[in-house]
């Protein structure tokens, strides 16, 4: 395994250099500041004052978490239900927040500009998101948006789509981070090509999720990847129940569902559930000190 890990490290070092040369740099201190600004903006008071704003439709389902934490698997399970549609990684939430940022450009940035949103604008943005998913799946009762990084936007999502459901996928931090490190995301996830950067991103993800879980009122279900692998039917029933859908056996045969999957896990979700990816990090343990030390208490 030493040889294969060395090859991964060389590839990641080269990729990081290439990204940095084109100005795509992950700066942990900037990321930490951005997460703190989200928490400061979407305070308990902010959310309380805007209760009942936005569009209350129960159609949107956001599956989010760290990349490579089981988001594609959970989406595929839900998409196997006859009344649900898997839309993949939609950019609509970031499109709406960028539009908000553009509106106040030069005066106030996102997320701080969210405090200027009126009740009518929140309803309008919620409707804009619904229009986008209705176009994709007019008949579906639930539409899954599995953009992992939406975990950063949960305060915004609650403000404009308070009736939506959030499924937060969790996976062992070492496996989750190593799986990112072993994946070439092409032009995204700039934090994933360096073990120290990955650890920094992961720590901030945990900090923000802990905050959302105690502050938000939107419905959130946490799904642990390893538990889903070990108790497939039990956890799948929990997911379908959370979505307020009737049970359907097709959700257990998710790997037979014919649909386009355009993410890094496309091949895995065509196989029945297995334990191959559980504790995979242990094979590479001797070379993961930077990651383990960076994760600290989370490792």
Task: Give the role of each language-model region.
Residues 1-60, 110-141, 180-222, 230-299:
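PAPS-dependent sulfotransferases, especially Golgi type II membrane carbohydrate sulfotransferases
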Residues 17, 80, 99, 163, ...:
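A short linear boundary/processing microfeature
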Residues 50-161, 169:
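Phosphate-binding active sites in nucleotide-utilizing proteins
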Residues 68, 147, 202, 229-230:
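Short alpha-helix boundary/capping motifs
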Residues 70-85, 153-165, 169-172, 181, ...:
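PAPS/PAP-binding and catalytic site of the sulfotransferase fold
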Residues 90-92, 150, 172, 226, ...:
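Short, solvent-exposed coil/turn elements at secondary-structure transition points
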Residues 175:
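Glycine/alanine-rich phosphate-binding loops at beta-alpha junctions
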């Amino acid at each position: 395994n030493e040889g294969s890990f060395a090859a991964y490290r060389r590839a990641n070092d080269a990729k990081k250099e290439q990204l940095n040369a084109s100005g795509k740099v992950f700066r942990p201190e900037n990321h930490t500041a951005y997460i703190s600004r989200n928490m400061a903006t979407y305070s308990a008071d902010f959310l309380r004052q805007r209760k009942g704003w936005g569009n209350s439709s129960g159609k949107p389902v956001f599956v989010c978490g760290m990349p490579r934490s089981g988001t594609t698997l959970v989406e595929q399970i839900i998409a196997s239900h006859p009344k649900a549609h898997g839309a993949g990684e939609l950019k609509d939430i970031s499109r709406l927040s960028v539009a908000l940022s553009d509106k106040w450009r030069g005066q106030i940035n996102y997320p701080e500009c969210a405090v200027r949103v009126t009740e009518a604008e929140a309803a309008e943005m919620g409707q804009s998101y619904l229009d986008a998913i209705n176009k994709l799946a007019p008949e579906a009762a639930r539409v899954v948006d599995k953009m992992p990084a939406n975990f950063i936007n949960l305060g915004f999502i609650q403000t404009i789509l308070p009736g939506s459901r959030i499924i937060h996928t969790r996976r062992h931090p070492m496996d989750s981070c190593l799986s990112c490190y072993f994946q070439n995301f092409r032009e995204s996830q700039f934090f994933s090509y360096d073990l120290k950067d990955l650890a920094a991103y992961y720590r901030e993800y945990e900090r923000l999720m802990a905050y959302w879980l105690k502050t938000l009122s939107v419905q959130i279900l946490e799904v642990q990847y390893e538990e889903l692998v070990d108790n497939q039917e039990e956890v799948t029933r929990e997911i379908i129940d959370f979505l307020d859908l009737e049970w359907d056996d097709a959700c257990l045969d998710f790997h037979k569902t014919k649909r386009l999957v355009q993410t890094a896990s496309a091949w895995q979700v065509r196989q029945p559930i297995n334990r191959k990816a559980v504790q995979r990090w242990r094979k590479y343990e001797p070379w993961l000190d930077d990651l383990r030390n960076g994760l600290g208490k989370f490792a």
